[in-house]
Amino acid sequence: FAAVSVDCSEYPKPDCTLEYRPLCGSDNKTYASKCNFCNAVVESNGTLTLSHFGKC
């Protein structure tokens, strides 16, 4: 079983597109897209991780 992860190395970005591809974070919040999720990961200093793809 491989851990689910996304590459957030190119973040944070000031603006996220309106693309809707939900991801569920380890904080049990649904993020609208990889961009929104990665910005939150950066803000959390890496403590936030990806729980799974799709809504929580």
UniProtKB/Swiss-Prot annotation:
Keywords: Disulfide bond, Glycoprotein, Protease inhibitor, Repeat, Secreted, Serine protease inhibitor
Alphabetized GO MF terms: serine-type endopeptidase inhibitor activity
InterPro entries tied to this protein: Bifunctional_prot_inhibitor, Kazal_dom, Kazal_dom_sf, Prot_inh_Kazal-m
Localization per Swiss-Prot or TrEMBL: Secreted
Site (Reactive bond 3): L18, E19
Glycosylated position list: N45
Positions of disulphide bridges: C8-C38, C16-C35, C24-C56
PROSITE patterns: KAZAL_1, KAZAL_2
Name this protein carries in UniProt: Ovomucoid
Coiled-coil stretches noted in the UniProt entry, renumbered to this chain: none
Domain notes: Avian ovomucoid consists of three homologous, tandem Kazal family inhibitory domains.
Listed SMART domains: KAZAL (SM00280)
Kazal-like domain ranges (all copies): 6-56
A Pfam family: Kazal_1
